[in-house]
Regions:
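GST-like fold's C-terminal all-alpha helical module
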Residues: 98-196
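A late-sequence structural motif
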Residues: 197-198, 202-203
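Short, solvent-exposed turn/loop segments enriched in Gly/Ser/Thr/Pro and often Arg
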Residues: 8, 161, 207-208
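Positions that flank functional sites
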Residues: 35-36, 159, 209-210
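Short, solvent-exposed alpha-helical surface patches in well-structured domains
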Residues: 90-93, 189, 202
Length: 222
């Protein structure tokens, strides 16, 4: 069975799917797609023009959460959703928090302004947006710390899709050195646990032309 993932290395939604595929030990061919310059083939696969897109034989799956839910149901080994229905609801809530709130308030304002505008050729960083992102990430790091106050992982005592959704966003911001790892030892320890997982290796190897990763980015010991 051929798995093919159309992705962009600094797309947090692509990263989330890559983490799930790797954690479930599913081999996949990665195809880097400059989604802002979509090819006709790419638009045929997803008229919305967004990554990630997962192709499995003749089936096409779009949107990261739909893909992740499919993979969880299709490949139940190495589960990333708890059995308890209330716990599953909490996982989904946290996934949505990072996919929506963190992405809009932090990722777009920091990664979007500082790197993606240059890559896309759409102008210069807006300092107002960058300042807002730098302000909001403090709130989100504190929220992660609050979640970890009485939990081993973000949604409970086992690692779940919630952790991968959060780590996908945080890793993109870490690529541009905009995460204050001294703000919370609990957050740093949580990220270190995820960072050390074999599933994370391909993300740590990502290189963006013109934007070298910081030295600590791939350092498992920070």
């Amino acid at each position: 069975m051929m798995h093919r993932l159309y992705h962009y290395p600094l797309s947090p939604f692509s990263r989330k799917v890559r983490l799930v595929l790797a954690e479930k030990k599913i081999e996949v061919e990665l195809i880097e797609e400059r989604y802002w310059e979509p090819s006709p083939e790419f638009l045929r696969l997803n008229p919305a023009g967004r990554v990630p897109i997962l192709r499995i034989n003749n089936y096409t799956f779009c949107e990261s959460n739909s893909i992740c839910e499919y993979l969880e149901e299709k490949y139940p080994d190495y589960p990333l959703m708890p059995n308890n229905v209330e716990e599953r609801a909490e996982v989904r809530r946290i996934v949505n928090w990072f996919d929506d709130s963190f992405y809009k308030e932090v990722t777009l304002n920091l990664l979007g302004e500082r790197i993606m505008k240059k890559i896309k050729g759409t102008g210069y960083p807006d300092s107002k947006n960058v300042k807002e992102g730098a302000k909001r990430i403090k709130f989100h790091l504190d929220y992660i710390a609050d979640l970890l106050d009485n939990r081993r992982w973000l949604a409970g005592n086992t690692m779940s899709m919630a952790d991968f959704s959060a780590a996908a966003q945080v890793s993109c911001i870490d690529y541009i050195s905009d995460v204050d790892w001294n703000r919370s030892s609990a957050v740093k320890d949580w990220y270190a646990k995820i960072k050390c997982r074999p599933a994370f290796r391909s993300l740590l190897a990502d290189q963006i032309s013109g934007f070298p990763q910081p030295q600590h980015y791939s350092d498992l010991d920070f």
